[in-house]
């Protein structure tokens, strides 16, 4: 037996224990060597405009693994016409940005950040890995990273998506409004100017 149940919480126990099995909510598959690979959480699934559900973690990991500047990424789609992303830069990556572009205007920096953001799509480890519909069309830079202090990370350093949404849901909504590309670019330019002191 994995566990008897949650202490004094029959409702939560009933949701996860069925016929002596614990349903964790993790999504995964067995690889060719028979190892279980966990790829995400059922609760975190996004919904493409065609109704297809997909896990955001693989794309988020691909972006952070290939990006020179972005340390955290949360992608979003709930049957919207396209996927969007929120990105953060830790202190080291902000310093890297300042060092790389200390004499360059914010517009040029944003062009370079856009190229950097989309690097994963052509990277050999990820090329052709994700359907185009799942890949973020727009990204918005956030003024602070996700941390335990702002409750956007939990104690195991995992992103708390609903807390990010509580804080930045309005920003996400503007990424779907008319002139979303221009509005998101203006938002990003303001943050870039603050980071680079231009």
Question: For the regions a protein language model found, what residue spans apply to each?
Answer:
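C-terminal boundary motif of the adenylate-forming
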Residues: 27, 32, 67-91, 125-129
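Short amphipathic alpha-helix segments
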Residues: 57-65
């Amino acid at each position: 037996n994995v566990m008897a149940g949650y202490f004094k919480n029959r409702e939560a126990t009933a949701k996860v224990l069925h016929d002596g099995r614990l349903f964790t909510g993790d999504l995964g598959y067995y690889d060719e060597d028979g190892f279980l690979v966990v790829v995400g959480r059922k609760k975190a699934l996004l919904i493409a405009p065609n109704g297809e559900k997909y896990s955001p973690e693989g794309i988020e990991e691909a972006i952070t693994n290939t990006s020179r500047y972005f340390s955290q990424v949360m992608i979003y789609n709930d049957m919207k016409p396209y996927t969007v992303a929120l990105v953060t830069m830790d202190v080291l990556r902000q310093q890297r940005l300042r060092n790389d572009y200390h004499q360059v205007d914010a517009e040029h920096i944003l062009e370079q950040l856009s190229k950097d953001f989309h690097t994963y799509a052509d990277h050999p480890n990820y090329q052709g890995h994700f359907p185009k519909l799942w890949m973020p069309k727009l990204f918005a830079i956030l003024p602070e990273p996700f941390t335990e202090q702002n409750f956007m990370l939990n104690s195991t350093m995992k992103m708390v998506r609903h807390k990010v949404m509580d804080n930045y849901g309005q920003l996400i909504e503007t990424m779907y409004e008319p002139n979303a590309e221009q509005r998101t670019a203006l938002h990003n330019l303001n943050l870039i100017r603050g980071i680079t002191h231009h």
